[in-house]
UniProtKB/Swiss-Prot annotation:
Biological process terms in GO annotation: translation
Quaternary structure, from the entry: Part of the 30S ribosomal subunit. Interacts with proteins S7 and S18. Binds to IF-3.
Gene3D superfamilies for this protein: Ribosomal protein S11 (3.30.420.80)
Residues annotated as signal peptide: none
PROSITE patterns reported for this sequence: RIBOSOMAL_S11
Chain's gene name: rpsK
Cited function: Located on the platform of the 30S subunit, it bridges several disparate RNA helices of the 16S rRNA. Forms part of the Shine-Dalgarno cleft in the 70S ribosome.
Lineage of origin: Bacteria, Bacillati, Bacillota, Clostridia, Eubacteriales
Name the record gives this protein: Small ribosomal subunit protein uS11
Cellular component, GO annotation: ribonucleoprotein complex; ribosome
Keywords tagged on the record: Ribonucleoprotein, Ribosomal protein, RNA-binding, rRNA-binding
Species of origin: Pelotomaculum thermopropionicum (strain DSM 13744 / JCM 10971 / SI)
Length: 129
């Protein structure tokens, strides 16, 4: 019995002008996701995906490279302007925003959406080094 040749569905080029860049910056990594205004993902990248491993993922330079990679892919879909939503306390917050601007995207809005508990879960005990 012969196998059927299946072709991978080629990603169609959407023509999206404006979108939202979500930057999640933790102490260990930075993840940049670019979506349209409805929330559908156009492109994403992270410090680990760009090629950094271990403690180098948490550097501002790794965040810059991740944002640049995501922006380049999004601009292929016709993206021109973004609103930036930043979440988390990591080192790559500002570097990622600057990199999006340097890549050629127009940043309209920068908003901090870091979740803050209203006295929710008990935090882990303090480290003693």
């Amino acid at each position: 019995m012969a196998r059927r040749v299946t072709r991978a569905k080629k990603r169609e080029r959407k023509n999206i002008v404006s979108g939202v860049a979500h930057i999640k910056s933790t102490f260990n990594n930075t993840i940049v996701t670019i979506t349209d205004t409805k929330g559908n993902t156009i492109s994403w990248s992270s410090a680990g995906q760009v090629g950094f491993k271990g403690s180098r993922k948490s550097t501002p330079f790794a965040a810059q490279m991740a944002a640049e990679s995501a922006a380049r892919e999004a601009m292929e879909h016709g993206l021109k302007e973004v609103e930036v939503m930043v979440k988390g306390p990591g080192a790559g917050r500002e570097a990622a925003i600057r990199s999006l601007q340097a890549a050629g995207l127009e940043v309209n809005l920068i908003k901090d959406v870091t979740p803050i508990p209203h006295n929710g879960c008990r935090p882990p005990k303090r480290r003693r080094v």
